């Protein structure tokens, strides 16, 4: 997994589901102390740990598996080619499963040309609804109404703004319109421990709105958050938008996604195509269609190198 919080959530889920079975589950990330990590690594090497969940920390030279049989890479779109190959080299011929809601163009192209198997899970969990997706220009009234509605049903809101300098200004704007709204700010330049505390506090419903950068996009599971507002949506890639939208709608409540962008007429052709695609493909299980659009817009990249998107200019290939 790409993030510490996501790794910890997976650890808790696995531990709960495998409770009572003779399978030890552990996790490795920067959140663990040196002593804890050392103990886990020792037990892993001796074969006492059946399932190890972790971030890029698993790539450390001190990580030794007794007999690695299966490698699962979650949120595959967040890893570069070299990192994924390094993961595969943990053991020769290890079975590998990569999972993502939106495969990056290079990975999707590998599957379409038959170099990798592709399985599509198009059936959502029971009692889930499509996320209502709307494109608006930046409007304080739209933002206020969206937050008020979510708070009226005791829900929570993600507000994504990728410019850290603007976050305090947006927080002041929300508190001016909704005085009783509890707003937290989170971004990647904060101390890891401070950021993780804010996210865990948000999970525990200590805040109504989490005003953050794209750090929230990687798989964090907060069923009580069912509205997401994405500012300057035209600046994000198609898979980024789909991943962020996927932070909501994880319960039996109707979820909403508001994409705030300048008028479509002022955007580039690619920017318009991205926003139109994310608005049109809002049904459950539509990630594969969005990935196909992304492949069409960005190109398949370099199948023999490290570029994971882009168009081949002078080199053809035959399948």
What function would you assign to each model-found segment?
Residues 31-52, 59-68, 192-209:
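Conserved motor-coupling elements within RecA-like helicase/translocase cores
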Residues 49, 56-58, 75-77, 215-216, ...:
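Conserved Walker B
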Residues 51-54, 72-73, 95-101, 110-111, ...:
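Structural recognition of the conserved hydrophobic beta-strand(s) that form the central parallel beta-sheet
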């Amino acid at each position: 997994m790409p993030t510490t919080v996501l790794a910890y959530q997976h650890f808790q889920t696995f531990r709960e589901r495998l409770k009572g079975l003779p399978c030890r589950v552990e996790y490795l990330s920067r959140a663990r102390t040196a002593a804890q990590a050392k103990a886990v690594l020792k037990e892993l090497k001796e074969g006492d740990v059946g399932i190890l969940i972790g971030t890029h920390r698993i790539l450390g030279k001190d990580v030794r598996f007794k007999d690695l049989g299966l490698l699962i890479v979650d949120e595959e779109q967040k890893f570069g080619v070299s990192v994924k190959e390094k993961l595969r080299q943990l053991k020769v011929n290890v079975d590998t499963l990569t999972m993502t809601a939106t495969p990056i163009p290079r990975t999707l192209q590998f599957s379409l040309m038959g170099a990798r198997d592709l399985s599509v899970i198009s059936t959502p969990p029971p009692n889930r609804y499509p996320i209502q997706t709307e494109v608006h220009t930046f409007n304080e009234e739209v933002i206020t109404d969206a937050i008020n509605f979510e708070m009226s049903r005791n829900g929570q809101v993600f507000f994504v703004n990728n410019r850290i300098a603007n976050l305090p200004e947006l927080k002041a704007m929300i508190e001016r319109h909704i005085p009783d709204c509890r707003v937290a700010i989170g971004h990647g330049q904060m101390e890891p421990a401070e950021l993780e505390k804010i996210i865990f506090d948000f999970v525990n419903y200590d805040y109504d709105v989490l005003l953050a950068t794209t750090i929230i996009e990687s798989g964090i599971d907060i069923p009580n958050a069912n509205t997401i507002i994405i500012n300057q949506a035209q600046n994000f890639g198609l898979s980024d938008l789909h991943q962020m939208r996927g932070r909501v709608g994880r319960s039996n409540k109707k979820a909403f996604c508001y994409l705030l962008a300048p008028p479509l007429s002022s955007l580039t052709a690619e920017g318009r195509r991205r926003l139109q695609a994310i608005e049109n493909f809002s049904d459950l299980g539509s990630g594969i269609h969005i990935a196909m659009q992304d492949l069409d817009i960005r190109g398949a990249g370099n199948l023999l190198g490290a570029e994971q998107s882009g168009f081949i200019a002078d080199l053809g290939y035959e399948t």
